[in-house]
């Protein structure tokens, strides 16, 4: 038989063979469909975000009522306390932190605490007790941010940046995932991200922006690998998105008109990079510098260095007029086109005050000032030092808002609208 020719089958046998092949293909397709059912959409849930609830000791009972009101909300998964468990005029004593920590621990809903500027930045003032801010931040890391003595089966499965050897101090930077949405907690306080304009070296600031940049980069890559539905980044300080420093061609001509350096510059550029890595919706939430009329603000203010709008990043600034009696609720519906719905909730006036917690004895003796944490060595690109994601990437142990356009080219799977506000 010549090369390239085939033996012809009888007409009847050819038809029977074709029918058998079609039947086998259908059976294989049916078996595959039964073996790998489509992924079920996650059910809707919500989370609460609060900030600056306690300013003076008299606010403590109201804070307890606030957390009790939040706990009574149906399908509420967790609470994020975005900074300031104390006021600027309160001394940063150990006993005060212990007292406020007990209020957070009493929450019946899992709670994630992010330090704010009054929690450590303003501790060096006379009203704050004249403490070293870096030492007070380290104290918070060892107490309020420490692991529980006993494992809590109902707690969130949180990954902390301190698990990375190079960033051991940064326990406050955290990441967790809930029903296809990745959440990131970050230490970026007001004002101006604790950038110091006085003479000397900004050691704490310089080291922290490296750690923060690494953590956002890694979270974006994590969300991409897990094919997350969305990503939420939460911190305390207002990054002033309308102020975006760009390289100036003749900056040396401005020597007689100095300006304050933008302490959030690196954070904003890291968010631009994260939006290019993870093309799904990214929600950035932070506390407002002043109370807002509706309790929150939704906009899309992030631009790249070339001025192009980063379309998949939406900002939600929270600023209730009465922080001790109002909280911001974010409803999450991963299966819907509009993933997030933001609303302001009031604590019912008839809600009873929970039992008073034991008062921690006052300690008026400040701790000795600690030396500043030494600078971290220069790091390579974060993609080369990111810790490996375990297996499939799991963690260890109203007014409608228009759809955000893509940052650079179409973003596959980007919903027409991802955030909605309810007045």
Predicted regions and their residues:
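N-terminal active-site segment of His-dependent metallophosphoesterases
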Residues: 34-96, 228
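His/acidic metal-ligating clusters that form di-metal
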Residues: 38-41, 71-78, 177, 183-184, ...
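Structural recognition of the beta-strand scaffold that forms the well-ordered cores
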Residues: 46-50, 77-82, 87, 110-115, ...
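Stable alpha-helical elements in mature extracytoplasmic
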Residues: 43, 49, 59-67, 82, ...
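Extended active-site neighborhood of metal-dependent phosphoesterases/phosphodiesterases
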Residues: 91, 96-211, 215, 298-331
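Binuclear metal-dependent phosphoesterase catalytic core
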Residues: 289-423
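Bacterial N-terminal signal peptides
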Residues: 18-31
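N-terminal secretory signal peptides that target proteins for export/translocation
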Residues: 1-14
């Amino acid at each position: 038989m010549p090369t390239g020719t085939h033996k012809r089958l009888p007409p009847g046998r050819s038809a029977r063979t074709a029918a058998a092949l079609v039947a086998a293909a259908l059976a294989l397709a049916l078996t595959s469909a039964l073996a790998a059912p489509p992924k079920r959409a996650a059910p809707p849930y919500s989370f609460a975000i609060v900030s600056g609830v306690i300013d003076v000791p008299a606010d403590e009972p109201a804070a307890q009522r606030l957390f009790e009101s939040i706990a009574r909300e149906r399908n509420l998964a967790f609470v994020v306390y975005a900074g300031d468990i104390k006021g600027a005029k309160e001394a940063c004593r150990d006993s005060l932190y212990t007292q406020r920590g007990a209020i957070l621990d009493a929450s019946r809903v899992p709670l994630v605490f992010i330090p704010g500027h009054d929690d450590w930045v303003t501790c060096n003032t006379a009203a704050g007790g004249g403490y070293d801010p870096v030492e007070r931040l380290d104290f918070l890391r060892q107490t309020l941010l420490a692991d529980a003595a006993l494992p809590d089966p109902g707690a969130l499965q949180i990954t902390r940046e301190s698990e990375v050897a190079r960033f051991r101090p940064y326990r406050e930077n955290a990441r967790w995932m809930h029903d296809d949405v990745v959440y990131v907690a970050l230490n970026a306080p007001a004002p101006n991200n604790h950038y110091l304009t006085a003479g000397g070296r900004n050691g704490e600031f310089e080291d922290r922006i490296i750690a923060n940049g690494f953590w956002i980069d890694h979270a974006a890559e994590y969300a991409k690998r897990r094919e997350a539905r969305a990503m939420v980044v939460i911190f305390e300080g207002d990054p002033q998105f309308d102020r975006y420093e760009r390289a100036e061609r003749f900056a040396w001509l401005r020597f007689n008109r100095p300006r304050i350096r933008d302490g959030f510059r690196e954070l904003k550029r890291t968010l631009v990079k994260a939006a290019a890595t993870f093309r799904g919706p990214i929600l950035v939430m932070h506390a407002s510098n002043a109370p807002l009329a509706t309790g929150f603000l939704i906009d899309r203010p992030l631009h790249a260095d070339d001025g192009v709008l980063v379309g998949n990043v939406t900002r939600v600034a929270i600023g209730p007029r009465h922080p001790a009696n109002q909280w911001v609720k974010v409803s999450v519906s991963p299966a819907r086109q509009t993933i997030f719905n933001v609303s302001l909730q009031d604590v019912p006036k008839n809600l009873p005050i929970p039992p008073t917690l034991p008062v921690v004895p006052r300690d008026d003796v400040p701790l000795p000032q600690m030396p500043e944490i030494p600078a971290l060595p220069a790091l390579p690109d974060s993609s080369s030092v990111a810790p490996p994601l375990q297996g499939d990437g799991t963690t260890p142990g109203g007014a409608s808002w228009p759809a955000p356009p893509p940052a650079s080219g179409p973003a596959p799977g980007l919903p027409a609208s991802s955030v909605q506000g309810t007045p």
